[in-house]
């Protein structure tokens, strides 16, 4: 019986690369996407489906966690809050694009699904560089989440949360993705737009900087 990994895939560059790395390690991939009614959900869902097709994933889940929007308090789900433009977060205070405890919620649900599917690993594309001020993007948080899941699931089930990108910067991620033939043109990073990436939000800036430092051109369309 093949080993199985649950890959949390947002439709973005990091989580997609993680799924490709899982496949390279010989895992049968079960793909998981969360719909929390963020601004670019339809685009992200479309990317998720295309990525699953490219990976030849046979089993995937799209789970409705729209209660995250009801909690609010962030610019990704609340359109009355402006998304910051042309500035990267450099403080230890979470930016307004931080969705409170999002990765904690995602991993709790992923733990349940991983137990049901008997997955030995969960792959999640957290990156500490992206998570300046994001308390749920650190290696320390992930280790505690793994302990929490293993403590709260059946005794004959143990899962390892794998974060192969957590210490990498965006340039290294771009380089690795292209080396592994990851179709980055199928991925989406923009926080605000679904047709053409804005090129100005925190996520777009990190992506563009990564491509520039790696010496490659991003193939997705930008407004600016």
From Swiss-Prot:
This is 7-cyano-7-deazaguanine synthase. GO terms for biological process: queuosine biosynthetic process. Keywords: ATP-binding, Ligase, Metal-binding, Nucleotide-binding, Queuosine biosynthesis, Zinc. Catalyzes the ATP-dependent conversion of 7-carboxy-7-deazaguanine (CDG) to 7-cyano-7-deazaguanine (preQ(0)). It comes from the Bacteria. Its cofactor is Zn(2+). Its EC number is 6.3.4.20. InterPro entries: QueC, Rossmann-like_a/b/a_fold. GO terms for molecular function: ATP binding; ligase activity, forming carbon-nitrogen bonds; zinc ion binding. ATP binds at residues 9-19. Belongs to the QueC family. It is an enzyme of class 6 (ligase). The keyword Ligase applies.
